[in-house]
Amino acid sequence: MRDGMGRLCIAKFPKPSDTDDVSAWEYVALQIARLAGICVPDFRLVRFGGRSILLLDRFDRSQAGRVPYISGLTAVQGRDGGSYSYLELVEFIEEHGSSPMYDLHELWKQMLLTCALGNTDNHLRNYGFLHDGKGRRLSPAFDVNPTQGDFDKSLSTAIDFDVRDADPRAAFGVREYFRLSAEEARHIASQTANVVARWKGLARKAGIDSRSVKEMSSCFECGKRRLREIAR
């Protein structure tokens, strides 16, 4: 669809069964990602009939037309329902990426935030690669959704081949595969923690009600705490 400015975008509507303002929380998560230095598509939140609708610009389109795109699942030659790891995306970037160092760092930042927010819907269709004429580039982050609670959450895509815990400390443990030193990873974790700490103000500016803010509090506070444990 096109928005009021004529820009090609994707509109994410709430489901009738949604009890929380899912689109608004995704909007908050995307704001956190952008403030943490993660590449995201341009996005905005609109209200219609008392419901939130998230609009995201299409990053697989340019003025010249369609930009070649494949999902992370296609990249690893996988199938729906299979079991996969971020390390398989690392291997794909190493073999096919036109800017592997940058994209490995970017993927690690995405993975770190996914862990901090308990984004358990991190299956490989929610990652993608564009073609820049020289090779593959990691796409901007999308479908970043925080999950309620501070309990242990299991990721759809594993950190490595054994660990599925949505824990930033697990992400820190595999940093070397992403060509990050301990010092670099701690710096990123510190910056990310400082942004996650702003979640409540971002939620209120997005118009999320106080009940939902209270219910999501443990998710963000736990993520912030675990990020700061890395940053020490």
Predicted segments with their positions:
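Conserved ATP-binding subdomain of kinase catalytic cores across diverse folds
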Residues: 1-81, 138
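Conserved kinase catalytic-core segment
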Residues: 20-34, 85-150
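Small/polar glycine-rich anion-binding or flexible loop at a beta-alpha turn
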Residues: 47-49, 107, 187-197, 219
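Catalytic-core segments of enzymes that bind and process phosphorylated/nucleotide-bearing substrates
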Residues: 77-92, 131-185
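Regulatory N- and C-terminal appendages and interdomain linkers associated
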Residues: 95, 136-138, 153, 201-232
